[in-house]
Structures are given as structure tokens and as C-alpha cells.
Amino acid sequence: MKLGEFADILPLSGSIAGETTISGLASDSRRVNAGDLFFALQGSKADGAAYAADAAGRGAVAIIARPGTVGDVGVPVIEADDPRHVLALASARLYGAQPATMVAVTGTSGKTSVAAFTRQIWEKAGLAAASIGTTGVVAPGRDEYGELTTPDPVSLHKLLRELADAGVTHASMEASSHGLDQRRLDGVKLAAGGFTNLGRDHMDYHPTVEHYHQSKMRLFKTLLPKGAPAVIFADDPWSEPTEKVALAAGLQLLTVGRRGTFLTIKRVEHERHRQRTEIEHEGMIYDIMLPLAGDFQVGNALVAAGLAISTGLPADKAVAALEHLKGASGRLELTGTTEDGAQIYVDYAHKPDALENVLQAVRPFTTGRVIVVFGCGGDRDPGKRPIMGEIARRLADVVIVTDDNPRSEVPAEIRRAILEAVPEATEIGDRREAIRTAVAMLNSGDTLIVAGKGHEIGQEIAGTKLPFSDHEEVRRALKERTA
């Protein structure tokens, strides 16, 4: 591709040769190849402008940077007010194709489930569908583990091109606040957007909850075209402010939930791992058995159904597909059962609202004790630690506080902050031992929640990521229990 083909994206001057061949895009100077455009992005810890000369030395044909941040480095410097936005558009231009119908969902909790459920609804209707998010990429013939909720623009558009080339026509993706704030989705052509809820999260990145909300609202304010559907869960404290944003942006507002008018929850009856749910849509009543536990999963399922319906799937097909949903990996996932029937769930809950939701979800079908094993991540919002401790104290009968990716922090200090709110908890720093202890104490009727990691397969300690899986540790503990 020639540099001139980016002329409507990049402010090219007469001194910059439009015939220059562009082989790729990079924002990390260490990954620059000859012929790449290098985007000097300002990060929280480093400024890409400081690495412009290194990028040029590695073969970059031009540097895109904020005005006045890069001097003479031997190759043309193209100044742009928002290099992140330009990178997203350039990535879309370079890779071109994407699945014809793309939807994105934002919110504090539930994004992974909604993206997965939307894909499953489309699949049930016979469509070639994919989902992209925290747990990775799932598509026909493809199931890859991932670590970023929203990939960087270059990786994202390369992936979208691969999916489109493979025949995928429909794709759902998570839109994290980081991803939205950092313009990673700015080149994606979206047909609809969804919102689940808003709670405390990423306070190490966002200065206030309001800033956090506004970052998420870029999905509705900026990325969706006017008239596009905005499917919003209506029963969250932040639903109304989100609805106002969607309306002000000229979007088609579709609300779901008990207060929802597009898909309305009329009745929910809990039956252990499933829920009989009555839903109203445009005067029609649908009675379905949702094979998932927890009120929050009903809301997630309806956001997914709303996204599928609003992008062209008949309502009866979308709602019928809800009876066949499978939970996303590590989302209230039944991982094991003891010989006397006590159940063990692994869940990704690593923030206050999510922990509260999952503990409330299992209470209706727990005849014995609710036991929870959890910790809080290091180098992340420290304010949530006592909040999560209080939630565990209030909603669980037995609490075991352990480590969960302490990173560069002293693990005992993280646990101490949690224990201030739940002093009666048992403290076991070794996560493997904490899970083993919890499984060993289970009696008939008990439910154990191992919270925090979900699908993750590592434990980050002092700069090293060690292999660790809550699923594997639960299974190992069950074997030891019956040995």
C-alpha cells in the first residue's frame, strides 16, 4: 500500500512522497520492520516520541506524532493531534475487510458473557459468527486464548481481516474503557452497541467514576453511526445516564431488563443451575428455560438477544436460542462437585459488583454454606480491597482471603487491606493451598466460589508470571479429597 492511500487520514505535506510503500504499522519501536509507519503514542509510563529515532533506525519510513514532540530523526515526521485515532483508522485502511455485521458491548461486568452469547445466538441461527474479548477469539475452527479485553488497533484489524477472509459475517466484541479511551475501536464499522452496567473498576486508570463512565460512552457518542441501535440494560443505577447519552447521540434506544421496553423481564424462577424466564417483546410473551444461574446472566442474555435482534435476526429465533446458551469460560462456571453434592464454581469476579453478583447468584440454590476464596490484584485500584472484603463478609458464610496476581506489591499488604473489612476471614496467601483448604471443608449443600481469575492461566508475582489455573487446582483438590 502507498502512503498516498492514507492521504485522507494523515496530514501529508508536499515534501512527503505519496508513492512511498508502506509495509505495516507499529507503535512499539522494537517491533518496527523496514517500510513501517511508526506511531509515537503517549502511554502512562512512556512516550513513544522518545523512541522515534530508534524506530527510524530500524527502517520506519515515517513517524506519526503529536505536534512538537519529535525533532529531526532522518525520516519524515507527520504531525497529528490524536495519533491513536489515526492509528486505528490507518489499521482499518491497511487491512480493509471486516465481518459485515459488527457489534460491541461495554460495561463493567458482563462484557465477555454478552459477546459470547451474541455469537452463540447467531451461530444457532446458522450464521458464521465470532466473538472477541477477554477470553480470546472464538470463531468457526478457531478458539484462541487472549489476555486483552480489546486488542490494539493493528492486531484487531489484522484479526478482523482474517475472520472476514474465513467467511465470518457476524462478530461481537468487548469494548473496554481502556480500549475506548485509547481509540482502539475507532476504525471498526459497528452496526450496534450494548451496555451492561457500571461499577467500581480501573480506578488506577480513571481519576473518577464519572471519567470511567464517559470513557465507555465513546461507544455511543463517537463510534456508532446515527440511528444505530444502542441496547442498554435498564436496571442498573447507570442505565439512565447511559440512555441519555445514546438519545443525545441520535441512536435508536432499545432497553432490556425489568425496566426495559424492548425486551422486558416479566418473571424469573430460579432452579439451581438454570432459570425459567418470561420475556415480553412487542406484545409477544416468550417462556424460556435459561441454562445459566444468576439474575445478572438474565440481563446479559437479554443484551445479547437485543443486539442480535436489532441487527436483523428475527426475535423468535434470538429468544429461542437463549435456551441453548453456554456460559463463557470462568464466568460462574461449574468446575466440580464433591462426592456428596457440594458444588464448586470458578468465576472471574475481581471487582466489587461482580463479586456481589456471583455471591448473590448462588444463594438461592445453596442449602448449606456459601464459601468464597478470593484476593485482589496488585498495582491496581487499592480502594476496592476493603469494599470487596465487606461484600464477602456480608454475603458469604466462610471467607478465605488469598493472593490474586500481587504483581510488584507485597502480597501480605494486599490481604491486610481486605481483612480490615472481614477480620473473621481465614488468611491463606498460597492460592493453591487456599483452594485445597476450601474444597476439603465442603459439606453436602455447600457452594464454593473461587473468585478472581476465571479463565486466566497465570499468577503474576514480582514481575514473573507463573502457570496457575483455578480450574486445575479445583480438580486437583477434589482428587485429593477423595484419595
Curated annotation (Swiss-Prot):
<keyword id="KW-0963">Cytoplasm</keyword>
<dbReference type="InterPro" id="IPR036615">
    <property type="entry name" value="Mur_ligase_C_dom_sf"/>
</dbReference>
<dbReference type="GO" id="GO:0051301">
    <property type="term" value="P:cell division"/>
</dbReference>
<dbReference type="Pfam" id="PF08245">
    <property type="entry name" value="Mur_ligase_M"/>
</dbReference>
<dbReference type="Pfam" id="PF02875">
    <property type="entry name" value="Mur_ligase_C"/>
</dbReference>
<dbReference type="GO" id="GO:0008765">
    <property type="term" value="F:UDP-N-acetylmuramoylalanyl-D-glutamate-2,6-diaminopimelate ligase activity"/>
</dbReference>
<dbReference type="Pfam" id="PF01225">
    <property type="entry name" value="Mur_ligase"/>
</dbReference>
<dbReference type="GO" id="GO:0000287">
    <property type="term" value="F:magnesium ion binding"/>
</dbReference>
<dbReference type="GO" id="GO:0005524">
    <property type="term" value="F:ATP binding"/>
</dbReference>
<keyword id="KW-0961">Cell wall biogenesis/degradation</keyword>
<feature type="short sequence motif" description="Meso-diaminopimelate recognition motif">
    <location>
        <begin position="404"/>
        <end position="407"/>
    </location>
</feature>
<keyword id="KW-0460">Magnesium</keyword>
<dbReference type="GO" id="GO:0009252">
    <property type="term" value="P:peptidoglycan biosynthetic process"/>
</dbReference>
<feature type="binding site">
    <location>
        <position position="456"/>
    </location>
    <ligand>
        <name>meso-2,6-diaminopimelate</name>
    </ligand>
</feature>
<dbReference type="InterPro" id="IPR004101">
    <property type="entry name" value="Mur_ligase_C"/>
</dbReference>
<keyword id="KW-0547">Nucleotide-binding</keyword>
<comment type="pathway">
    <text>Cell wall biogenesis; peptidoglycan biosynthesis.</text>
</comment>
<keyword id="KW-0131">Cell cycle</keyword>
<feature type="binding site">
    <location>
        <begin position="107"/>
        <end position="113"/>
    </location>
    <ligand>
        <name>ATP</name>
    </ligand>
</feature>
<feature type="modified residue" description="N6-carboxylysine">
    <location>
        <position position="216"/>
    </location>
</feature>
<dbReference type="GO" id="GO:0005737">
    <property type="term" value="C:cytoplasm"/>
</dbReference>
<dbReference type="InterPro" id="IPR000713">
    <property type="entry name" value="Mur_ligase_N"/>
</dbReference>
<feature type="binding site">
    <location>
        <begin position="404"/>
        <end position="407"/>
    </location>
    <ligand>
        <name>meso-2,6-diaminopimelate</name>
    </ligand>
</feature>
<protein>
    <recommendedName>
        <fullName>UDP-N-acetylmuramoyl-L-alanyl-D-glutamate--2,6-diaminopimelate ligase</fullName>
        <ecNumber>6.3.2.13</ecNumber>
    </recommendedName>
</protein>
<keyword id="KW-0067">ATP-binding</keyword>
<feature type="binding site">
    <location>
        <begin position="149"/>
        <end position="150"/>
    </location>
    <ligand>
        <name>UDP-N-acetyl-alpha-D-muramoyl-L-alanyl-D-glutamate</name>
    </ligand>
</feature>
<keyword id="KW-0133">Cell shape</keyword>
<feature type="binding site">
    <location>
        <position position="380"/>
    </location>
    <ligand>
        <name>meso-2,6-diaminopimelate</name>
    </ligand>
</feature>
<feature type="binding site">
    <location>
        <position position="29"/>
    </location>
    <ligand>
        <name>UDP-N-acetyl-alpha-D-muramoyl-L-alanyl-D-glutamate</name>
    </ligand>
</feature>
<dbReference type="GO" id="GO:0071555">
    <property type="term" value="P:cell wall organization"/>
</dbReference>
<comment type="function">
    <text>Catalyzes the addition of meso-diaminopimelic acid to the nucleotide precursor UDP-N-acetylmuramoyl-L-alanyl-D-glutamate (UMAG) in the biosynthesis of bacterial cell-wall peptidoglycan.</text>
</comment>
<keyword id="KW-0436">Ligase</keyword>
<feature type="binding site">
    <location>
        <position position="182"/>
    </location>
    <ligand>
        <name>UDP-N-acetyl-alpha-D-muramoyl-L-alanyl-D-glutamate</name>
    </ligand>
</feature>
<dbReference type="InterPro" id="IPR013221">
    <property type="entry name" value="Mur_ligase_cen"/>
</dbReference>
<feature type="binding site">
    <location>
        <position position="452"/>
    </location>
    <ligand>
        <name>meso-2,6-diaminopimelate</name>
    </ligand>
</feature>
<comment type="similarity">
    <text>Belongs to the MurCDEF family. MurE subfamily.</text>
</comment>
<feature type="binding site">
    <location>
        <position position="176"/>
    </location>
    <ligand>
        <name>UDP-N-acetyl-alpha-D-muramoyl-L-alanyl-D-glutamate</name>
    </ligand>
</feature>
<keyword id="KW-0132">Cell division</keyword>
<dbReference type="InterPro" id="IPR005761">
    <property type="entry name" value="UDP-N-AcMur-Glu-dNH2Pim_ligase"/>
</dbReference>
<dbReference type="InterPro" id="IPR036565">
    <property type="entry name" value="Mur-like_cat_sf"/>
</dbReference>
<feature type="binding site">
    <location>
        <position position="184"/>
    </location>
    <ligand>
        <name>UDP-N-acetyl-alpha-D-muramoyl-L-alanyl-D-glutamate</name>
    </ligand>
</feature>
<dbReference type="GO" id="GO:0008360">
    <property type="term" value="P:regulation of cell shape"/>
</dbReference>
